[in-house]
Amino acid sequence: MAKVNIKPLEDKILVQANEAETTTASGLVIPDTAKEKPQEGTVVAVGPGRWDEDGEKRIPLDVAEGDTVIYSKYGGTEIKYGGEEYLILSARDVLAVVSK
């Protein structure tokens, strides 16, 4: 995982999606048009968190750089930076952190 010069704002998270499966368990090759959009990725950068209702302190996020997360299928915004594809997600789009 390369370091990127993108710093998410507030409760946003920068994720690099894991590669989609290219073959089935029985060895059949899956064409690009039939591949499922991956819902798992690695957190590359994390914003500082959003402000609380009083605007006095930041609410920290539940994820950190390097975490593997499962996120909502249609959540986030896809971007390309430095030849790599990333996803900028809101903290609400993250469904779970995968234990290593």
UniProtKB/Swiss-Prot annotation:
Record-stated family: Belongs to the GroES chaperonin family.
Single Gene Ontology BP annotation: chaperone cofactor-dependent protein refolding
Source species of the chain: Mycobacterium marinum (strain ATCC BAA-535 / M)
Keywords, comma-separated and alphabetical: Chaperone, Cytoplasm
Cited PROSITE patterns: CHAPERONINS_CPN10
Subunit organization: Heptamer of 7 subunits arranged in a ring. Interacts with the chaperonin GroEL.
GO cellular component, as recorded: cytoplasm
PANTHER family assigned to the protein according to its UniProt record, in alphabetical order: 10 KDA HEAT SHOCK PROTEIN, CO-CHAPERONIN GROES
Organism phylogeny: Bacteria, Bacillati, Actinomycetota, Actinomycetes, Mycobacteriales
Role noted for this protein: Together with the chaperonin GroEL, plays an essential role in assisting protein folding. The GroEL-GroES system forms a nano-cage that allows encapsulation of the non-native substrate proteins and provides a physical environment optimized to promote and accelerate protein folding. GroES binds to the apical surface of the GroEL ring, thereby capping the opening of the GroEL channel.
Molecular-function GO term, any one: metal ion binding
NCBIfam families with a match to the protein in the record: PRK00364.1-6, PRK00364.2-2, PRK00364.2-4, PRK00364.2-5
Gene3D superfamilies for this protein: GroES chaperonin
Annotated localization: Cytoplasm
Listed InterPro entries: Chaperonin_GroES (IPR020818), Chaperonin_GroES_sf (IPR037124), Chaprnonin_Cpn10_CS (IPR018369), GroES-like_sf (IPR011032)
Protein name: Co-chaperonin GroES
